[in-house]
């Protein structure tokens, strides 16, 4: 926060332009989240438990050389010299934000190292990780909140703007990939393509069919939860498909997104529902004569939650959490579609007929409910998924990044190719086990590999 105006519309537009990178410098950043449960009682770990979240963070910091991140004397995250970090989602979900890396071999290896570290610690401390899109057993009031002030502000505001925002915060997990863009034209094409295709990713990665020990009626309950969270900051912004879309239009959209907080001198101030535009003009209620800094703008960008989000890179946000092979498969899917020019052209051609917000809203619910058997526009999602996997496979082949054994990045698409071959999403497989060998005992879910 500043005492004089240092930001204007042109400068915050420039911030997105400053994210442009030459093709040879494009990197891949992967983020993935896990639920942590006590192994004996199958309750979500709380922050202050004897061997809870804070204890785990301290153990990683002290034994594995991670730097601590604190807020109000509470340990809330870690960062590593490699560029990766560990942060806490509102209900104690562990999120690894991977370092930006050059190829999928590197990013998959990084995810594997993190999971192996967490498995080692989980065995020592008697907790279990679960890689799903939605907590399969816990009720809202059984989940403890993490001591982060921004979460307290969001917790208080969410019920005013939607029915499922609290569930989104504490009962969901996702896998995301962050990708670069060359210039404004490239950003536009990647943004429009990926936004129109998110329901396909939602279907392929659907992995959240349970709620509170029962069937949820959805294959991706996580995706459905987002449909009733906060319509002003989530979903499919129609501006993305407008003929004049670009950095300026995206900035206008973000200025229309209500604020949540201001962070200044180590303290969070609740400004939920207020206007960033007024803040820019020094007229924010309660903060008259104060103006945003660039870091205030960066914070504000993080409280928009569309299915694809532009920061200084593009975030793909439509997939459920899952195990290691799908943590590798999600970036592989999108890198194959967007990081090779022919693949981008081909996937844009596929996506073009879906670039309608009403259609996409319907398609997301269809994907969440029926997975590959859902509908996108006039097409079956399974058919579009097959076309996209073919395009992605060819794109990864043309990238021609091979590991030390000469194997290309296409190997990371294998879980998705198997899904299409069998016609069963991860959620379908869970339902088959639940209704079969598990004999409807939801606690058998803790035996699956994560």
Regions from the PLM with identified roles:
Residues 1-163, 171, 206, 326, ...:
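Terminal catalytic/cofactor-binding subdomain
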Residues 35, 95, 176-180, 315-317:
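Structured core elements
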Residues 37-39, 99, 180-182, 319, ...:
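Solvent-exposed residues in well-ordered beta-strands and their adjoining turns
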Residues 123-124, 129-130, 134-309:
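Loop-rich catalytic cores of soluble enzymes, especially ATP-dependent carboxylate-amine ligases
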Residues 274-358:
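Long, well-ordered mid-to-C-terminal structural blocks that present hydrophobic/aromatic surfaces
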Residues 400-404:
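Charged, low-complexity interaction regions
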């Amino acid at each position: 926060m500043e005492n004089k105006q240092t930001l204007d519309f042109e400068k915050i537009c420039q911030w997105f332009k400053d994210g442009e990178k030459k093709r040879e410098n494009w990197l891949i950043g992967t983020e993935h989240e896990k639920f942590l449960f006590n192994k004996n009682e199958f309750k979500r770990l709380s922050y202050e438990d004897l061997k809870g979240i804070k204890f785990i963070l301290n153990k990683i910091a002290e034994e594995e050389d991670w730097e601590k991140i604190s807020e109000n004397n509470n340990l809330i995250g870690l960062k590593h010299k490699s560029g990766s970090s560990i942060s806490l989602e509102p209900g104690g979900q562990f999120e690894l934000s991977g370092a930006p890396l050059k190829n999928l071999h590197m990013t998959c290896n990084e995810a594997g190292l993190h999971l192996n570290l967490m498995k080692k610690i989980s065995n020592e401390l008697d907790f279990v990780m679960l890689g799903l899109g939605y907590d399969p057993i816990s009720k809202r009031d059984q989940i403890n909140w993490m001591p982060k002030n921004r979460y307290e502000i969001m917790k208080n505001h969410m019920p005013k703007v939607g029915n499922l925002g609290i569930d989104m915060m504490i009962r969901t997990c996702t896998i995301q990939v962050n990708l670069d863009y060359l210039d404004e034209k490239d950003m536009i094409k990647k943004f429009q393509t990926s936004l129109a295709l998110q329901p396909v990713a939602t279907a392929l990665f659907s992995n959240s069919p349970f709620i509170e020990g029962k069937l949820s009626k959805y294959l991706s309950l996580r995706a459905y939860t987002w449909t009733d969270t906060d319509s002003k900051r989530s979903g499919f912004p129609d501006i993305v498909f407008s003929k004049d879309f670009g950095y300026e239009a995206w900035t206008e959209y973000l200025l229309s997104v209500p604020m949540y907080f201001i962070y200044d001198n180590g303290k969070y101030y609740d400004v939920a529902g207020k206007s960033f535009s007024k803040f820019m003009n020094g007229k924010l209620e309660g903060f008259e004569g104060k103006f945003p800094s660039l870091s205030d703008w960066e914070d504000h960008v993080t409280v928009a939650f569309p299915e694809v989000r532009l920061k200084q890179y593009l975030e793909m946000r439509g997939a459920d959490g899952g195990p290691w092979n799908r943590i590798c498969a999600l970036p592989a899917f999108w890198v194959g579609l967007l990081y090779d020019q022919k693949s981008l052209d081909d996937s844009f051609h596929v996506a073009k007929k879906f670039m309608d917000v009403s259609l996409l809203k319907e398609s997301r619910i269809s994907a969440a409910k029926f997975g590959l058997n859902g509908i996108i526009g006039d097409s079956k999602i399974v058919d579009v998924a097959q076309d996209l996997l073919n395009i992605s496979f060819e794109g990864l082949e043309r990238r021609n990044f091979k590991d030390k054994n000469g194997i290309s990045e296409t190997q990371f698409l294998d879980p998705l190719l198997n899904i299409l071959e069998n016609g069963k999403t991860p959620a379908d497989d869970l339902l088959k086990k639940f209704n079969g060998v598990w004999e409807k005992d939801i606690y058998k879910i803790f035996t699956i590999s994560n």
